Amino acid sequence: MSKRDYYEVLGVARGASDEELKKAYRRCAMKHHPDRNPGDAAAEAAFKECKEAYEVLSDGNKRRAYDAHGHAAFEHGMGGGGGPGGPDMGDIFGDIFGNIFGGGAAGPRAARRGADVGYVLELDLEEAVAGIERRIEIPTLIECAPCHGSGSEDGKVETCGTCHGRGQVRIQRGIFAMQQSCPHCDGRGTLIQNPCKTCHGAGRVEEDKVLSIKVPAGVDTGDRIRLAGEGEAGPAGTPPGDLYVEVRVREHAIFQRDGDDLHCEVPIRISQAALGDTVRVATLGGEAEIRIPAETQTGKLFRLRGKGVRSVRSRSEGDLYCRVVVETPVNLTADQRELLQQFEATFTGEDARKHSPKSATFIDGVKGFWDRMTS
């Protein structure tokens, strides 16, 4: 049977970058990995195919040879450096699967740990600031109870006679010697003659796990909480992976967060801005007062020390910044409109410049601009 194009195997364009190749290989390998598809011959073949494709395309010399000659580049010694499967893949697997399966390709698969699991936890701002204990439910692989994770119905596990329990075999390709996973035991180092009827020899079963998570006060979007040993159960009774809970804080109707500081807008009336007043504002700890001085303009910031968020790391407290917005009155009555018209009539001549200096400066600027344009 003819081999598929390596770029097609990984699902990338021929001009794909090294990073795109690596991501594509990660997706392909994770999808077809034998640990996730126990007993599935088609998945195992697909896994080996994407492994071979990545080995060639991730090597600059081999990729150039493949682009020029296709699969023929690795027949009869062409291409140099051995054909696909030549070099030890330990470094690649250590990089890509190191954090997922607990190590590189060296040694029996039994030395690997379970996969880490990710979970996104959404919180309201108040919950993130105060801290909370939350119960979550996650689908994951847990140790098979009937066989205690061994994968064997009777608990008996035999040492592989091909690799003698090492999970690796040494092969020679021309002048190159390499280690690869034992094809007889699939790198486990052991064989199961009587597979467990519950897990079919995998040693693990899918189940929804319920956990209680204590979220510390002050967390923010992007913070991660690690729960050691709460990830997927390891294959063949090996240690489990970890659970990483990523926090996402929902947008708040009043406050915007910037680190440990909070920001909000405080609308005030024209009369309050002109004459001054004391207004009450909301904080996460209750109400507080702000004294608005006379002649306050839109955009003025008022700082309330210690009314922000207590830092999850240093335990110091942030501040609350209140930005004043002078609100234009709407739905005026006839009397209110008349009073405002009378008030506006007082802004004439130099009085207008004195009471509205920014407006006067703006008008002068516009007049000067047109004078220069028409002169």
Swiss-Prot record:
- Chain positions recorded as Zn(2+) 1 binding sites: C144, C147, C196, C199
* Positions with a binding annotation for Zn(2+) 2: C160, C163, C182, C185
Task: Note the zinc finger regions (CR-type) by start and end residue.
Answer: 131-208
Q: Report the residue ranges that make up the J domain in this protein.
A: 5-70
Q: Does the keyword Glycoprotein apply?
A: no
Q: Name one GO molecular function term.
A: ATP binding
Subcellular localization is given as:
Cytoplasm
- What does this protein need as cofactor? Zn(2+)
Q: In which ranges do the CXXCXGXG motif repeats occur? A: 144-151, 160-167, 182-189, 196-203
Q: Which UniProt keywords apply?
A: Chaperone, Cytoplasm, DNA replication, Metal-binding, Repeat, Stress response, Zinc, Zinc-finger
Reply yes or no: does the keyword ATP-binding apply: no
GO CC annotations?
Answer: cytoplasm
Any one Pfam family match given in the protein's UniProt record, by short name: DnaJ_C
Mind telling me which InterPro entries this protein's record contains?
DnaJ (IPR012724), DnaJ_C (IPR002939), DnaJ_domain (IPR001623), HSP40/DnaJ_pept-bd (IPR008971), HSP_DnaJ_Cys-rich_dom (IPR001305), HSP_DnaJ_Cys-rich_dom_sf (IPR036410), J_dom_sf (IPR036869)
GO biological process: what's one of them? response to heat
**Record's cofactor remark:** Binds 2 Zn(2+) ions per monomer.
Please give the function described in this protein's UniProt entry. Answer: Participates actively in the response to hyperosmotic and heat shock by preventing the aggregation of stress-denatured proteins and by disaggregating proteins, also in an autonomous, DnaK-independent fashion. Unfolded proteins bind initially to DnaJ; upon interaction with the DnaJ-bound protein, DnaK hydrolyzes its bound ATP, resulting in the formation of a stable complex. GrpE releases ADP from DnaK; ATP binding to DnaK triggers the release of the substrate protein, thus completing the reaction cycle.
Its family remark reads: Belongs to the DnaJ family.
The annotated subunit structure for this chain is:
Homodimer.
The Swiss-Prot or TrEMBL note on domains reads: The J domain is necessary and sufficient to stimulate DnaK ATPase activity. Zinc center 1 plays an important role in the autonomous, DnaK-independent chaperone activity of DnaJ. Zinc center 2 is essential for interaction with DnaK and for DnaJ activity.
Name this polypeptide is given = Chaperone protein DnaJ
Q: Which organism is it from?
A: Xanthomonas axonopodis pv. citri (strain 306)
Q: What is the lineage of its organism?
A: Bacteria, Pseudomonadati, Pseudomonadota, Gammaproteobacteria, Lysobacterales
